[in-house]
Amino acid sequence: MIDLPYPEDRKLVKYLAFSIGFMMCVLRISTAAMQMACGIAVLLGLILWHKNRDTIALSEEIKAYMKAYGVFLLSLIPSILLSDSPATSLKGFFNEWIWRYVVFILIVVFIKRREYLVNLLTAYLTVMSVECMFTLVEIMNHMRPDGRGAGFNRMVLSLGGIMCMLLPVAMVILMDSRFEKKLKQSAVFSVAGTLVGLLCNKSRGAWLTELFVVPIATFQYLKQNKKRMLAVAAVFLGILGFMLSSPQYVQRIESITNTTTDRSNADRILAWKSAEIMVRDRPVTGIGLGRFREHYQKYRFKEEKQDLGHMHNNFIHIAAENGIVGLAGLLYFIGFYLYTSLRNHRKNKNPYDILVFTICLGYICIFGQIDYTLGVSDGMRMLWFLLAVLLQLKETERLSGEIPSASGISVAEIPDGSGLVHR
């Protein structure tokens, strides 16, 4: 495998990679440190762009993914302009949809050396594994009144959503021979840590999501190796047996379909009914981007006890805040990512496309049915980070000839070491 050519300012690129890695490692530990690292990364990116703006080149595949997200961003503009507080909506638009996306842009534009990409992913898997293991410490020491592990961040569902991305990635890295040894070593720890985290976090939504995405991500590898299939089945049955032998887990599983006495489920349904009324009142552009909290009290049912801060559903929340226009943009964006990644994987079997598919399916579509994952800052940054790294790793293999081009661009049409494009 060869390294993707990158701009001549090699030290700046190295510092940029370090800043991004540091940002991802402290993302759920210190907001201040994360924002500082992000600011430094953006500054380095601007310097690199200014010095190399005439020679920067992206693959057609990455451009297409970026354009699809751009369509979604455009669909949000009407809900900003017609909001009862356009300034607040504009601020929310930048913070929620632009600033969190920056990490994707920085990686796909500037981090083109496979060594850096592998190091970034290795560091991310290692830190997240430690956080997942920390949930066991929380449980054993009764650190939370609800008896659940939240990791380094107080948001329980946030960690649950992240693990829905983490487990498929780690398992595929372990099973696919393309990945480097040190990445596989971190993946071993990551699989173990995530399984512990899933048990200690006790997110029912995460359990159900993993039942969908893990088989999809690992199917081709398990089909080829019966020993591997038996090992995975043994681990699954062992975990299932442990859960069924524990009254607290049995109760947790049984509560999945309880929509009456389980307030978590019942309040979500009431909030969704409120959203239905919101959409009826403002069907085209919604109540305004980022204006849910201000408007929800007018629509909230008295029976809803938790005073939810969002709709706990990606599609319903976007429909309420951004109307049919915003929902259509979201469906196009997600549909494009799912269709393109699955189509590319079927054409040329590789770990990168199937992981892009399962990450988007699991985090946004499935876990996003019970939580507003699009609004979770650390979760979305991790999603964009993972997608960018995976797509860039795929590019390194495309340029080495191991994966045929999905875009029709030949290897002769890529930048050389100086950043110049040769055709």
Per-segment meaning from a language model:
Residues 1-88, 112-122, 173-185, 226, ...:
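Transmembrane signal-anchor hairpin modules in multi-pass inner-membrane enzymes, especially those
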Residues 20-24, 74-77, 102, 115-144, ...:
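Alpha-helical transmembrane segments of multi-pass inner-membrane proteins
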Residues 34-45, 91-104, 157-173, 206-217, ...:
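Hydrophobic core segments of transmembrane alpha-helices in multi-pass, intramembrane catalytic enzymes
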Residues 40-46, 333, 355-369, 373-413, ...:
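Transmembrane alpha-helices of multi-pass inner-membrane enzymes
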Residues 196, 200, 221-263, 273-281, ...:
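A membrane-periplasm/extracellular boundary helix in multi-pass inner-membrane enzymes
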